[in-house]
């Protein structure tokens, strides 16, 4: 989970009047529990960051839904898709990414910020799934405003595949990025 926390702290995430699943940034842990009284949360804390999570189905995919609090204030929320389904193929994970991407692009104007490590298939969208399976590309799309930062990621590292959609207060994301930079 530590690696997941680090990954998510590097990922700038969003804010609206209801920023993440009926919650607004700045709300407390108590308000989360009042909003979801029937939900049994898993709790983790590291370096002063409290994460409350539970499993759900989002977009038809088994998902860990997590709420990140700092000083009892909601700073970000994220979806970790199909985290423990190790048998799911790269092709199926890419299809999941595209399905979630369609939903996001219907609501927001997402910007493609993908990183190509080998651009052999970059101009052939019919081969993107293969390029991903080969480790040639990490898919990333973002949406930014003064109040909102959304980041949707599909990446492959060694034998692990990560698919995360995150929403965060942009000031918090900026702060976390600055702190991570000072660690190097």
Residue ranges and their predicted role:
Residues 17-26:
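Cleaved targeting-peptide boundary
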Residues 5-6, 20, 60, 92:
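Generic detector of short alpha-helix boundary/capping microenvironments
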Residues 3-16:
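Sec-dependent N-terminal signal peptides
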Residues 15-18, 85-87:
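A short, structure-level motif marking secondary-structure boundaries and short turns
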Residues 1-4, 72-73:
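Short hydrophobic/aromatic-rich motifs at helix boundaries and adjacent loops
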Residues 28-184:
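A cross-family detector of function-defining hotspots
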């Amino acid at each position: 989970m530590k690696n997941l926390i680090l990954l998510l702290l590097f990922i700038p995430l969003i804010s609206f009047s209801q920023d993440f699943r009926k919650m607004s940034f700045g709300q407390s842990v108590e308000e989360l529990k009042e909003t979801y009284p029937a939900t049994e949360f898993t709790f983790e804390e590291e370096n002063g960051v409290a994460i409350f999570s539970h499993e759900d189905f989002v977009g038809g995919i088994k998902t860990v839904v997590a709420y990140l609090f700092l000083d009892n204030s909601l700073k970000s929320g994220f979806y970790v898709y199909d985290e423990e389904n190790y048998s799911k193929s790269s092709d199926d994970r890419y299809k999941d990414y595209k399905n979630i991407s369609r939903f996001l692009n219907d609501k927001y104007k997402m910007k493609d910020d993908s990183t190509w490590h080998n651009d052999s298939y970059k101009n052939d969208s019919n081969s993107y799934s293969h390029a991903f399976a080969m480790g040639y590309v990490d898919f990333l799309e973002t949406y930014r405003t003064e109040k909102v930062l959304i980041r949707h990621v599909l990446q492959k590292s060694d034998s692990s595949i990560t698919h995360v959609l995150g929403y965060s207060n942009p000031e918090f994301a900026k702060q976390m990025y600055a702190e991570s930079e000072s660690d190097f």
